[in-house]
Design a protein with these regions (language model features):
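A composition-driven surface/loop motif
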Residues: 2, 11-292
Length: 292
């Protein structure tokens, strides 16, 4: 196992996978640490980033959005305004804080679909089911995982089909588990490739724990920004562990990652200011088939 520690450096942009350990911080949540190898890495107390095709000079960083929003960092929510979803095979239900009927949630078999912006607190379990988010593309949704176990043999466990941004919050003191299947059954116009898949911006935060198994391809994949500011993660994936097409930004959390390809990846190389990985904090143990 290779272990490297850094005390000071400049943060760089990453065009694709995290393959060379480089940087420290220019802001964000906190200074963190990182190291990587194709076998394993254990890291603490430094911020890192890298580029497959070279590293960006400090003068070039202006094109990159390296900041975290207040809501990215704040995992709190108003419990009195939330909708509570109890997951159960064939019997999932939703209610308000005062136990009234809840709008914005539909149930079909083992699938639960959220259709309105707001905060949704999920608990319970689904076997061969999925939680969908399909809201207005200019609105936001917060999913609070409060002791959730979801498995889906032929698709993702959480699938954001439409939203401006979705926040997945890990409730304090809870352990949550998501496991997808090795083969997806998809309609012609569908494209999920991960246990948690979002077509739009996605943030993971909170202080709870999340175990993610990506048997099909990836564990977490966003087609826009993927941001993580807290939580404890045990991740296993056939291909990539954490994949944000436009960017991957992490400023906190503990990560135990085993994957067949890249642990941390961003792949948009066609737009200026996109396709970078920025690490501003966190504790990482990584075993990756590719160069992380």
């Amino acid at each position: 196992m290779e272990k490297r520690q850094f005390t000071r450096a400049a943060r760089c942009a990453a065009c694709c996978a995290l393959s060379v350990v480089l940087a420290a911080s220019l802001g964000g949540c906190a200074a963190a640490s990182a190291a990587s190898s194709s076998d394993a890495a254990s890291v603490s107390d430094v911020a890192v980033a890298s580029a497959v095709n070279g590293t960006a000079a400090a003068d070039d960083l202006g094109a990159y959005d390296l900041e975290y929003s207040k809501r990215d960092l704040d995992a709190s929510y108003d419990a009195t305004q939330a909708t509570y979803i109890a997951l159960a095979d064939g019997a999932s239900s939703a209610e308000t804080y005062t136990h009234g009927s809840a709008d914005g949630v539909s149930v079909s078999g083992n699938d639960v679909t959220i259709t309105q912006a707001g905060t949704y607190v999920l608990s319970g379990s689904l076997t061969d089911g999925c939680v969908f988010v399909n809201i207005d593309e200019e609105e936001k949704c917060q999913l609070v995982l409060n002791g959730v176990s979801i498995s889906n043999g032929d698709g993702p466990c959480i699938y954001v089909t439409a939203a401006d941004k979705t926040f997945i919050t890990l409730a304090d003191g809870t352990e949550n588990t998501l496991v997808d299947g090795a083969d997806y059954v998809l309609d012609e116009d569908e494209e999920p490739t991960a246990t948690i898949f979002s077509k739009d911006d996605l943030t993971l935060n909170g202080t709870g724990a999340l175990n993610i198994t990506g048997n099909y391809r990836h564990a977490v994949r966003s087609k826009d920004d993927l941001i993580i500011t807290g939580g404890t993660y045990v991740i296993s994936a056939v291909e990539d562990a954490l994949n944000g097409k436009d960017c991957l930004k992490i400023c906190g959390g503990a990560f135990d990652i085993t994957c067949g390809e890249d642990a941390l990846k961003s792949s948009n190389d066609s737009e200026e200011g996109r396709g970078f990985v920025a690490i501003d904090g966190g504790d990482f143990t990584i075993s990756a088939g590719d160069n992380t």
